Amino acid sequence: MNFMTSLHDVQRQVVHMAGSCLTFIPMRQRGTGVSSVLWTILICASSVSIAADNHAPTLQGDRFKKLVPFRPTAQFIIGATFNFPHLGTPAEEIFENDFQVLTPGNAFKQTAVHPRPDVWGWKKADAMVEYAKEHGYTMRLHAPISPQCSAWAEEDHRTPKELLQNLEEYVAGLCNRYKGEKHVRWVDVVNETITREGKWFGPKPGVGKWQNPWTQIGFDESHPLRPPIYIKRTFEIASKHGPHLKLLFNQHGGMEKPMWDRAKVTVDYLRDADVQIDGVGWQAHVSAGWERIPGNMQSLDRLIRWTHARDLEFHVTENTVWMDDPRTGTQEAQAATFRAIVTKLAEHSKRGVVVWNVWQLCDSHIQRPQKKGTMFDTSFQPKQSYYAVQDVLRQYSEAVKQ
């Protein structure tokens, strides 16, 4: 074992120990001296990691948060995602220098928090909530009822009653646990409810596939849309148990018209039923050159206008730009796509709240690292995309000052 490997092992063990300790401390007690001790442990872990890893890069120009600082009343908000295992890595350092709004990956999903009856897993979620509080970050919890669910929920013999009980316990438990945390501002309530073809995304036989078992709870037969019962029920529970939270309807895909037509009708269905909904989210996992495909930018423009016309926020929640096509997947093309999306959001900030969240801060931290979808390569060096976004934010900052 060499010296660098030893440092990595120590860092991982110390972060794990701190997270395990946090599991046993009630949230209401985490402003006390006990919390300070644990965060001293995490700081030590970070120091060890920095000795073992490359430092975050020295970047040219103003950092993002200086150009577009977060304010609770801001109309244009920027944020980023990094995960619990990335504490103490250069990704954390990049985030600290550029962002003030954190979405901690998948630590809050059903599969992690309440995968089956009588089983709860709060370690990573609690650690990230406490971390954000200690650093003064605002949070969005990516905690939707969605296809990213546990194997227990996917089992073919699962009954509607069992699924509904697990859903209600999970959503109520999550909102109750963090309802006193004022820095937790948004939560993704549902995600990936509709296919690109405009159908309700449903279950598949077996376990381990990308599927949505929650539609088995049933459908609202009183409405022509026949929306799945779980959608409205999830929003109702989140509103009841998380009264300070802003609730988002998040959707994957591109700008497929059948998908968004159904999503819009679903949002109106919730509003007509006086169910709280505060924003619409689009994941924005796209390939380089996406903005050059005819109709895409026009459809995005119309979607944002439609959202703002209902006094809702519009969020780009998980932006990656894949460099997966050898013909078009260049750094220049990726930078142009990031630039186009962020520019469109900045334009609409005059009419309503827009939020841009970039998904991960290193190519090796995403689910498909071979697609190189982030603004930083596997050595945490910035790509042209970083400077393209920086330029958009600089122009926005200058325009606001005029």
Map each language-model feature to its residues.
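Bacterial N-terminal signal peptides
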Residues: 36-47
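Boundary/entry segment of secreted carbohydrate-active catalytic domains
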Residues: 54-101, 105
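Structural preference for beta-strand elements that scaffold enzyme active sites
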Residues: 75-79, 101, 138-140, 184-188, ...
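Acidic-and-aromatic substrate-binding clefts and catalytic sites of carbohydrate-active enzymes
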Residues: 80-92, 110-123, 194-197, 253-263, ...
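Short, acidic/polar
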Residues: 84-96, 166-174, 258-270, 338-342
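Substrate-binding cleft and catalytic face of glycoside hydrolase catalytic domains
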Residues: 97, 101-115, 124-248, 252-254, ...
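Aromatic-rich peripheral "rim/lid" segments of glycoside hydrolase catalytic domains that contact
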Residues: 188, 192-222, 237, 291, ...
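Glycoside hydrolase catalytic-domain groove-lining segments
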Residues: 224-250, 257-326, 346, 352
